[in-house]
Regions:
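Glycine-rich phosphate- or other oxyanion-binding loops that anchor nucleotides, phosphorylated ligands
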Residues: 73-110, 118, 164, 171-172
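Mixed-charge interfacial surface used for oligomerization/domain docking
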Residues: 29-43, 48-50, 102, 115-130, ...
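An N-terminal domain-start capping segment
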Residues: 14-21, 90-94, 107-113, 191-197
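Short catalytic-loop micro-motif centered on adjacent basic/acidic residues
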Residues: 24-25, 78, 105, 131, ...
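N-terminal glycine-rich anion-binding loop in soluble enzyme alpha/beta folds
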Residues: 22-86
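Short, Lys/Arg-enriched N-terminal segments with co-localized hydrophobic residues
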Residues: 2-18
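Short beta-strand->loop
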Residues: 107-109, 132-135
Length: 301
């Protein structure tokens, strides 16, 4: 079972068990846990969250602390991507500890944050660093990273061009949709207007947000209780997106009821989908989706 990151500092696992000359890198917004990063040999660079007058590394504190602060003050948390300095440290440390290695950085959607731009500035002109926009976030980015990491473990002799080709194929096929747990976070952060927020509250509407070409797009609105709309999404989303049945990941925000999680797994298993794990949202996604969010990630056939 996949669980959230619990450490915000730069995590450099080295070559892991693969001994590949290619080392992967991603941001904490991918919601890859320290344990999984170690298994896959992925370096995690922290993104940042500002609340209570302090900017902190994503993953360095529990997401509940952020939720409690917002509940008490109504001051929305703000998120920011990795800085050029973050990548100077990350690239430098990885290459120093792994002489002769190459880095493949699979970036959090460049449409949503400055992280990739920061990395490009630092890596400019370097042939030992390759940067690819995953055009996804959270577990969508994680799924792409996992696919490349497993390919490298199976074929450690793989070239950087070959690994990049696998990444691009995965990026073209990955699909992600989620339902925010609390629209108040989207409204407070300026992601939805007050009018749209009030209308949704009055009518009991829950928007489905899909990641399309790196952008977060509201594609549909469900009506009813959170339990009802999540069950409906679980029935509709995988088939509507022609997801492969052998690899589905489920996303949940802190506070999503265990009974809802069990119901969703039952629905998907009845349809023949293999749930590979639950991914709990870290602070970057949770700052916008709030507690109790739900999402589905998979690869199109």
């Amino acid at each position: 079972m996949l669980t959230p990151s619990t450490a915000g500092a730069l995590r450099v696992p080295g070559r892991g068990n693969t001994m590949s000359k290619i080392l992967l890198m991603a941001e904490s917004g991918s919601d890859i846990t320290p344990e999984l990063a170690g298994q896959l040999g992925v370096t995690i660079v922290p993104m940042h969250v500002t609340f209570a007058g302090e900017t902190r590394d994503d993953g360095a504190f529990p997401v509940t602390q952020m939720f409690e602060h917002y509940k008490a003050t109504r001051e929305p948390p703000r998120t920011s991507g990795c800085t050029p300095h973050d990548f100077e440290v990350a690239f430098g440390r990885v290459l120093e500890e792994n002489p002769g290695a190459q880095i493949l950085y699979l970036a959090y959607s460049a449409c949503t944050t400055c992280s990739m731009q920061s990395a490009v500035m630092v890596a400019d002109g370097r042939e030992d660093i390759r940067i690819i926009d995953t055009k996804s976030v959270s577990a969508g980015q994680m799924a792409v990273v996992m696919r490349v990491a497993k390919a490298l473990q199976a074929h450690p002799e793989m070239t950087l061009d070959e690994a990049a080709a696998i990444a691009k194929d995965a990026i073209a096929k990955v699909r992600m949709g989620f339902i925010p747990g609390d629209l108040d976070y989207l409204r407070a952060g300026g992601r939805v207007s007050n009018a749209a927020y009030l209308g949704a509250k009055i009518l009991g509407l829950h928007p489905l947000i899909e990641v399309q070409d790196g952008k977060l797009i509201s594609t549909k609105k469900y009506r009813g209780s959170m339990a009802r709309v999540i069950a409906q999404m679980a029935r509709e989303y995988p088939e509507a997106n022609a997801l492969r049945k052998d690899e589905v990941y489920l996303i949940y925000g802190e506070g999503l009821a265990q009974s809802i999680r069990q119901e969703v797994e039952g629905i998907l298993q009845e349809k023949g989908y293999a749930v590979r794990g639950w991914v709990r949202t870290g602070c970057v996604i949770a700052a916008h989706s709030g507690p109790g969010s739900f999402g589905i990630v998979g690869f199109a056939e």
